[in-house]
From Swiss-Prot:
It comes from Neisseria gonorrhoeae (strain ATCC 700825 / FA 1090). This is Lipid-A-disaccharide synthase. Keywords: Glycosyltransferase, Lipid A biosynthesis, Lipid biosynthesis, Lipid metabolism, Transferase. GO terms for molecular function: lipid-A-disaccharide synthase activity; phospholipid binding. Condensation of UDP-2,3-diacylglucosamine and 2,3-diacylglucosamine-1-phosphate to form lipid A disaccharide, a precursor of lipid A, a phosphorylated glycolipid that anchors the lipopolysaccharide to the outer membrane of the cell.
Length: 390
């Protein structure tokens, strides 16, 4: 752990970062790289995943312990999550970082930020919560909790500005990093998939709790597609070692004995580019599929209690980011009771068998890519270092 210092050397600022899931780990890794380009001596600590640690980040706690989704699922783990948050606040108040950056995971990170801001430590939140979709009353509280919000989508900053806060659109890092052009042939060669066969990608989530709900449904869907397309190949990128282990456990069930599935270590972009169509849970992964210009079917199941709560609160007609950003149902969303293998398989087959529909969708996804494409990591790094006084 970095030692406490009474005098701050702005050439080597101590930057605290906290992430709660795999998508935040990716954002954090890009942010660290950009910070180090501007300030090579920066020191970084807090909570991070494997990608951040590969960039030299010192993680004080296991990021996987925070990776849960849904009201019921969070309640089960709440005592542990609250303990980690208390201990992180204690550690950071002792270390006195020059700035704190919470990346996504707002229910965890905004509580940390509020306590640190009260102690005089500048705070930023990177990735606005979906206040435009539900719980818009949170905006005023977030303005109180952090000094600045870094937004990934263009409709978000004005909500904070109207509430007297500071916010800016920095673009989405995936749009910056992913090429605009499509290259399915190269992706298939990389993964050893023949160009002439049907290829479907399965993305059942980056959290173990998501795998438990979605992997069995996705695997049953794959078996139905295999009946329709006997030569089909199925690809699945595992976000973390923990999800990879859980996927292996599900695949060992007798009902999936006939399913040949290629599980990759991450490589989600390559997997999506190689696919003719993608079955994906809601969340950031849907945007990655869109930026790969691939047709998709969005599906999600959570506990009935969680779903009933969310359905009452949500203020937008869609759950998938591509549909929300395009303002229409460009791709199917089959949720909860609609998330049946028969329906999912039929929707994926519809994309595979109608290339004209795919071509029109790719035009929409290309325009969306251009809208979100900025030098995101550098813009975020500049804001972080400004708040740190560098």
């Amino acid at each position: 752990m970095w030692g406490q210092t009474n005098m701050v050397d702005k050439k080597s600022p101590l930057i605290a970062v906290s992430v709660g899931e795999a998508s935040g780990d990716l954002l954090g890794a890009h942010l660290i790289r950009a910070i180090r380009k501007r300030c090579p001596q920066a020191r970084l600590t807090g909570i991070g995943g494997e990608l951040m640690k590969a960039e030299g980040f010192e993680s004080l706690y296991d990021q996987e312990r925070l990776a849960v989704r849904g009201f019921v699922e969070v309640v089960r783990r709440l005592p542990e999550i609250l303990r980690i948050r208390r201990e992180l606040v204690r550690d950071l108040l002792s270390l006195k970082p020059d700035v704190f950056v919470g990346i996504d995971a707002p229910d965890f990170n905004l509580g940390v930020a509020e306590k640190l801001k009260r102690a005089g430590i500048p705070t930023l939140h990177y990735v606005s919560p979906s206040v435009w979709a539900w719980r818009r009353e949170r905006v005023g509280k977030i303005v109180h909790q952090v000094n600045r919000v870094l937004c990934l989508f263009p409709m978000e900053p004005q909500l904070y500005l109207d509430a007297g806060g500071r916010a800016e659109f920095v673009g989405h890092p995936m749009a910056q990093l992913m090429p605009l052009e499509d290259d399915r042939e190269t992706a298939r060669k990389t993964l050893g998939a023949d160009v002439g066969i049907p290829v479907f990608a399965l993305l059942p989530g980056s959290r173990v709790s998501e795998i438990d709900y979605m992997a069995p449904v996705f695997f049953q869907t794959a078996l139905l597609l295999l009946e329709r397309y006997p030569a089909a190949r199925f690809l699945l990128p595992a976000a973390t070692e923990a999800t990879k282990r859980r996927l292996a456990e599900v695949l060992q069930r007798p009902e999936f004995a006939g399913l040949a599935l290629t599980v990759t270590d991450r490589q989600s972009e390559t997997v999506c580019r190689a696919a003719d169509a993608v079955l994906v849970t809601s969340g950031t992964a849907t945007l990655e599929v869109a930026l790969c210009k691939r047709p998709m079917v969005i599906s999600y199941k959570i506990s009935p209690l969680t779903y009933a709560y969310v359905k009452r609160k949500i203020k937008v007609p869609h759950v998938g980011l591509p549909n929300i950003l395009l303002g229409k149902e460009a791709v199917p969303e089959l949720l909860q009771s609609e998330a049946k293998p028969e329906k999912l398989a039929a929707a994926l087959a519809d994309w595979y068998e109608h290339p004209d529909k795919v071509a029109a969708l790719q035009q929409d996804f290309g325009a969306l890519h251009l809208l979100l494409k900025k030098d995101t990591a550098d813009l975020a790094a500049r804001a972080v270092l400004e708040e740190a006084g560098c």
